[in-house]
Amino acid sequence: MLDFAIFAVTFLLALVGAVLYLYPASRQAAGIPGITPTEEKDGNLPDIVNSGSLHEFLVNLHERYGPVVSFWFGRRLVVSLGTVDVLKQHINPNKTLDPFETMLKSLLRYQSDSGNVSENHMRKKLYENGVTNCLRSNFALLIKLSEELLDKWLSYPESQHVPLCQHMLGFAMKSVTQMVMGSTFEDEQEVIRFQKNHGTVWSEIGKGFLDGSLDKSTTRKKQYEDALMQLESILKKIIKERKGRNFSQHIFIDSLVQGNLNDQQILEDTMIFSLASCMITAKLCTWAVCFLTTYEEIQKKLYEEIDQVLGKGPITSEKIEELRYCRQVLCETVRTAKLTPVSARLQDIEGKIDKFIIPRETLVLYALGVVLQDPGTWSSPYKFDPERFDDESVMKTFSLLGFSGTRECPELRFAYMVTAVLLSVLLRRLHLLSVEGQVIETKYELVTSSKEEAWITVSKRY
């Protein structure tokens, strides 16, 4: 249920291909500014590949042609929206369907039945309640997992380089699996097995949609199908175990089991939530720590807030909610890292943006990465400045884009809480330090990551 999610060229173009295959779009560009196809068969795919990612392609396209632009995927028209003003005209606040969920389900070959409005609303509420209840019931577990990572880092000599991406992914995998799927994943080997299968599925979904490469490679296809089958098998087992029984630990699956959903719906929704939450949580944790090591004054201010609010007492969910500056740091992390730079919606009916007509069944991209660095929307857009979120109008814009408030997706809400707890635990005891000379380059994938491992060092506060 990720309302606004990023797609890298490998992934998003595959999703675009899937949607446009299912819903053929108009051949007419309707007078929308943009570029003509580079090749008859592939459209502007070569231009996107040459740009390095879809996000970078859209940045260049919007710089050249303005807030509403068009390009071609194969022989199908795609429209991209690149400012807050045009997004406001297109975003429907009453939409309950999530485009990322729908497309990800199609790539997993699940049934993407939209159902009726009331059913979609009910499933959305189940998701939201599932996140709320699993965070509340498993808060002590979250503290425990954070403290385990703290103990590991405390054991390192101050000169030792810490592989941040690796550790954050491991922490996210443990947190998500145990809080979403339960005590099965208290076993370290089960987490490792899940992480391996998750990695295989995550890296393969979308591949081969353009050239059929997955179907052409018997080995790759079998590895993908085996990994997906193993993930589904463990989920089916857990769903069966949780039905009709009471457990002291309330996990995410329980909220779906207790709702009016059949086993296949529970399986699909849990799979989508698990796949997305693991990566979003891992990357939010990674980028937050990266920025804190780069901006020492911001780390100092965050530590002072944590010390003032938490003191020497236990960390509680109520206290975490009081960490206002921490939330600003996380919002600015999402914005600066462009954690989710592209989203997509199918144009259900013919629509109009400014003076442009968007034909029915056109794929409309929300170029969120472009919007998040738009100087017309953000002052000093390339500066990491958490205090910009003191401004209520800035928060309203952020909420409109789906990163906060009532439009905030459940996976991101989950990640915000997990990251806030982890930072509170770590900063109480440690200074987080950058490695001199390290340059972290960004890779725009399904969730934005660093191209290489990001290294940090730590030193003890006491």
UniProtKB/Swiss-Prot annotation:
Main location: membrane
TM spans (from-to): 4-24
Root EC class: oxidoreductase
Entry binding sites for heme: C409
Residues forming coiled coils: none
Keyword Membrane: yes
Known cofactor(s): heme
Localization per record: Membrane
Taxonomic superkingdom: Eukaryota
Keywords, comma-separated and alphabetical: Heme, Iron, Membrane, Metal-binding, Monooxygenase, Oxidoreductase, Transmembrane, Transmembrane helix
Presence of the UniProt keyword RNA-binding in the record: no
UniProt EC number: 1.14.-.-
Gene Ontology MF terms: heme binding; iron ion binding; monooxygenase activity; oxidoreductase activity, acting on paired donors, with incorporation or reduction of molecular oxygen
Residue pairs linked by disulfide bridges in the UniProt entry: none
GO cellular component: a single term: membrane
InterPro entries to which the protein is assigned, alphabetical: CYP450_20A1-like (IPR052666), Cyt_P450 (IPR001128), Cyt_P450_E_grp-I (IPR002401), Cyt_P450_sf (IPR036396)
Membrane-protein topology: Single-pass membrane protein
Family to which the UniProt record says this protein belongs: Belongs to the cytochrome P450 family.
Name of the molecule in the record: Cytochrome P450 20A1
Gene name for this UniProt entry: CYP20A1
